[in-house]
Every structure is written in C-alpha cells, then in structure tokens.
Amino acid sequence: MAIRNFRPYTPGTRTRVVTDFSEVTGRKPERSLVVSKHRRKGRNNRGVITCRHRGGGHKRLYRVVDFRRNKHGITAKVAAIHYDPHRNARLALLFYADGEKRYILAPAGVQVGQTVVSGPDAPIENGNAMPLSAVPLGSSVHCVELYAGRGGQMVRTAGASAQVMAKEGDYVALKLPSTEVRLVRRECYATLGEVGNSEVRNTSLGKAGRRRWLGRRPQVRGSVMNPCDHPHGGGEGRAPIGRSGPVTPWGKPALGLKTRKRNKPSNRYVLRKRRKTSKRSRGGRDS
C-alpha cells in the first residue's frame, strides 16, 4: 500500500494526499454482512446535540465485523480485502471451512488466499487469534480483549499495535500505542500483527468539502462568537478570551484537563501511565 499525491490542478488537489487503495480487492461488500444503521448526527435520544460538529456526509452501510474470533480450530481463507467507510482500517473477508463468512480487521501483510485460524493452539502467524498466554514475549498484537469473550476493544485503528512485555500470574503486561503499560487477563484473546493501512496517517484531505463528505461540520472558534454563545466571545475586534485559560462552551477547563477519575477501580491495572504527547500551555488555541 502506498499514498498518492496530486498536482495542483485546483486548490483542492494542491495539498491532497490519499491512499491508493491498491490493497483493496473487493469492489462490493458481502451482502450477508451488511446492515443499515441510523446516523445519530451528534444527537441523543431527545434530539439534543451532545457531540458538536457532526452531521451530513455520504450515506453508509455498516459492515458487521467479528471482533470475538470465537470459531476456534476452524481454518478460514482470506477471500478479499474490502474498504470500510466507518474506519480507516481495511476489512478482510474470511470464508470458513464450514461455509460461514465473516469480516475481521485486515492485519498488515495478510494477502488474499492466505489461511488464518483462531484458538489456543493456533500457529504464530499474522492474522491468527489466540489467548495472550499463548503469544510470545515481544510480539505485536491488535484487537485486544479487555474482558474474555467480549471481543476486541483496544488497538483497532489503522496501523496500531500493542507489544507483549511480560507475563506474570493471571495477567499479561501490554505496551499500548499510547505508551501506557497495562495488565490484561491472560485468557483474553488478541490477534497477531498490527492493523493494516498504516499509511493513512500521512494522508491529507486537501479541502473542506472532503471533510463534509465524512460527516464533519465546520468548527467555529469561540473567540469569534457572541458572549451568549461561548465564554470566549465578545469584546471589540480580536479581543483575548479574558480568562486564565481556555474553557469549553459550558465553562469547564479545556486543553489539558484530566477527566479520568483518580480512584477509578481499573487504575490498579495500569503499570505505567501514558506519556504526554504535547506540551500545550493553558493559553493555547481556544475551543
């Protein structure tokens, strides 16, 4: 897989960078694994906006993805690599030996025609799923379960992988993409390898219209609003926000405020907290 650059024929193509979709082999999704899904557009059950800047975009059909990998011991053949409009990762269409079809997240390096299998006795190969107790130390895994049998909940985005650091007792230490080291039960399943389509981090939309196609509406700075709409609003001309630090539209501190509870029960499983990715001062860009 590679990325594709464009010549500046128009302002929208000047900075446009996209993936070339060379790894995608299937044109249409498997009809038995596609369902319709109502788009919430950032609203809750009462119709109130709970997530701003959402709405519009191209219509989508949801692909049912198998995050559990619970067909143990049954080999499956990779029939095609499909595009998924709901995520950056690609999907691998599996044809199982018993005739069932399922989608999984396409691991990096998995090719059409390759066979994968899940279970505690699965071989150590990319795309195979097994308990963390059977994964060798230092291996990269993705689609990691937090609770056994619930399905993969962590490390599912394109290009992501976690590293098995240590095993002790009933737990396995994983180094997550955020650099956090966390304990996970040894019976939880994970898939070997990293998620494919890692080059997506190098892409650029190029124009505002492509962001609208994805269902993202414009973000307006609070400093250009009226005081009735945002705490940063008001003043004459380009006035400062008039506060010691930026706040949300509802007056709560923004940009750097930790929202995780100090006494959260799962803190006991975090061996090392994630490192900070940026050092923004409290006088940074307002929300």
UniProtKB/Swiss-Prot annotation:
Spans annotated as Disordered: 221-287
Pfam families: Ribosomal_L2 (PF00181), Ribosomal_L2_C (PF03947)
GO cellular component, one term: large ribosomal subunit
One BP annotation, GO: translation
Residue spans of biased composition, Basic residues class: 258-287
Keywords: Ribonucleoprotein, Ribosomal protein, RNA-binding, rRNA-binding
Molecular function terms, GO-annotated: rRNA binding; structural constituent of ribosome; transferase activity
UniProt cross-references to NCBIfam families, sorted A to Z: rplB_bact
Family: Belongs to the universal ribosomal protein uL2 family.
PANTHER family from the UniProt entry: LARGE RIBOSOMAL SUBUNIT PROTEIN UL2M, RIBOSOMAL PROTEIN L2
Protein purpose: One of the primary rRNA binding proteins. Required for association of the 30S and 50S subunits to form the 70S ribosome, for tRNA binding and peptide bond formation. It has been suggested to have peptidyltransferase activity; this is somewhat controversial. Makes several contacts with the 16S rRNA in the 70S ribosome.
Self-association state and partner proteins as the record states: Part of the 50S ribosomal subunit. Forms a bridge to the 30S subunit in the 70S ribosome.
Name by which UniProt lists this protein: Large ribosomal subunit protein uL2
Organism: Parasynechococcus marenigrum (strain WH8102)
Lineage: Bacteria, Bacillati, Cyanobacteriota, Cyanophyceae, Synechococcales
Encoding gene, per UniProt annotation: rplB
